[in-house]
Amino acid sequence: MISSNDFRTGTSIELDGSVWRVVEFLHVKPGKGSAFVRTKLKNAQTGSVVERTFRAGETVPQATLEKRTMQHTYKEGEQYVFMDMETYEEVRLSPEQMGTTVNYIKEEMEADVLFWNDTVLEVQLPTSVILEVTDTDPGVKGDTATGGTKPAIVETGAQVMVPLFISIGEKIKVDTRDGSYLGRET
């Protein structure tokens, strides 16, 4: 059990048979009446966001999440197959379960997989990955004086905005949180 006074961004709680993650919270102490905690909660399974108010000191069950480091071994049809490196147990995930991580995951890449009651909630990639550019327009010298960007397709099929000097075959570092270009990988 966790008190509503202890809510922080990222705290996971169980409500109505689902796991909810605290996205925002605000402790409110009105001049009259008792204090309360106003929260914005995101459902870990469906992604829906709701606002909910708790009395100060109200206790709710804290979700017990298990984080396992797993390796993406291969893709079978539409399913992404992950293997637990300790138990060699395989888990198959759909693109819906993977979310936006499908844009940046390669075979043999390790990721943290969050489980709740043996149900996969989320796949967490490292904050940056190195990907090879497979398609982009050639940059022409003198295109711009201030430095511009152009779209590039990387080996996973995702589109990343890159500087004009990046060409096909180069390896680039990409932020997995927002898909932005971080730099060249030498």
Curated annotation (Swiss-Prot):
SUPFAM superfamilies: Nucleic acid-binding proteins, Translation proteins SH3-like domain. One of its GO terms (biological process) is peptide biosynthetic process. Pathway: Protein biosynthesis; polypeptide chain elongation. Keywords: Cytoplasm, Elongation factor, Protein biosynthesis. GO terms for molecular function: translation elongation factor activity. InterPro entries: Elong-fact-P_C, NA-bd_OB-fold, Rib_uL2_dom2, Transl_elong_fac_P/YeiP, Transl_elong_KOW-like, Transl_elong_P/YeiP_cen, Transl_elong_P/YeiP_CS, Transl_elongation_fac_P. GO terms for cellular component: cytoplasm. The keyword Oxidoreductase does not apply. Transmembrane segments: none annotated. Belongs to the elongation factor P family. This is Elongation factor P. It comes from Crocosphaera subtropica (strain ATCC 51142 / BH68) (Cyanothece sp. (strain ATCC 51142)). The lineage of its organism: Bacteria, Bacillati, Cyanobacteriota, Cyanophyceae, Oscillatoriophycideae. The gene is efp.
